[in-house]
UniProtKB/Swiss-Prot annotation:
Main location: nucleus
Database matches in PANTHER family: DEHYDRATION-RESPONSIVE ELEMENT-BINDING PROTEIN 1D (PTHR31839), DEHYDRATION-RESPONSIVE ELEMENT-BINDING PROTEIN 1E (PTHR31839:SF21)
Gene: DREB1E
Protein's name in the database: Dehydration-responsive element-binding protein 1E
GO cellular component: nucleus
Compartments, record wording: Nucleus
Record-stated family: Belongs to the AP2/ERF transcription factor family. ERF subfamily.
DNA-binding region: 52-109
Entry-linked Pfam families: AP2
InterPro entries membership: AP2/ERF_dom, AP2/ERF_dom_sf, DNA-bd_dom_sf, DRE1A-I
Biased composition (Low complexity): 1-19
Keyword Transcription regulation attached: yes
Keyword DNA-binding part of the UniProt annotation: yes
Length: 219
């Protein structure tokens, strides 16, 4: 089956077609104009979705996966695992245009012009091959990929060092004195709830009732 260039002036038959307003990149929605919805509330699971690209998730460190859902069904089309998030995002754009046409929401506004898209109604395998082919066009050179990874690691190391220096400026004082003072307050409060002990030499006869008379004065 022949390919169709959306926005490039070619139809599925391979013959040139007039370029009109429908072929403009502005006719497609993008994640910047219609960002994907996020579930509200707190989540206990680890978030794997890319914060910007639609249809892209992180699988392992340095790996990104992409899958798309059929417009009128629950079935998903697995597009593959890619080295960069941009490669996975480009694969998503190809599959989205092949499945939804002008109603597709793209990650990049220039995808209709730069990517080769199967015609509407193409099978899953054909869409997957086109998505992988589009992703390979944006594979970074080995040196560029390593440089980007090293730059990210350097930024993380600098942030860690800055945090360590920040906490080093604020010394941590021992809490022994404060704990001792608090224990004294606790002992005082406990002592107020206990009856004081009798004084030395004090008799307990006053607590008993006696019927006898006692002479208070003696002459």
């Amino acid at each position: 089956m022949e390919w169709a260039y959306y926005g490039s002036g070619y139809s599925s038959s391979g013959t040139p077609s007039p370029v009109g307003g429908d072929g403009d990149e502005d006719s497609y929605m993008t994640v910047s104009s219609a960002p994907p919805k996020r579930r509200a509330g707190r989540t206990k699971f680890k978030e794997t979705r890319h914060p910007v690209y639609k249809g892209v998730r992180s699988r392992n460190p340095g790996r990104w996966v992409c899958e798309v859902r059929e417009p009128h069904g629950k079935q998903r089309i697995w597009l593959g695992t890619f080295e960069t998030a941009e490669m996975a995002a480009r694969a998503h754009d190809v599959a989205a245009m092949a499945l939804r046409g002008r109603a597709a929401c793209l990650n990049f506004a220039d995808s209709p012009r730069r990517l080769r898209v199967p015609p509407l109604g193409a099978g899953h395998e054909e869409i997957r091959r086109a998505a992988v082919e589009a992703a390979e066009l944006f594979r970074p050179a080995p040196g560029q990929h390593n440089a980007a990874a090293e730059a990210a690691a350097a930024v993380a190391a600098q942030a860690t060092a800055a945090s360590a220096e920040l906490f080093a400026d604020f010394p941590c004082y021992p809490m022994d004195g404060l704990e001792f003072e608090m224990q004294g307050y606790l002992d005082m409060a406990q002592g107020m709830l206990i009856e004081p002990p009798p004084l030395a030499g004090q008799s307990t006869w006053a607590e008993e009732d006696y019927d006898c008379e006692v002479n208070l004065w003696s002459y």
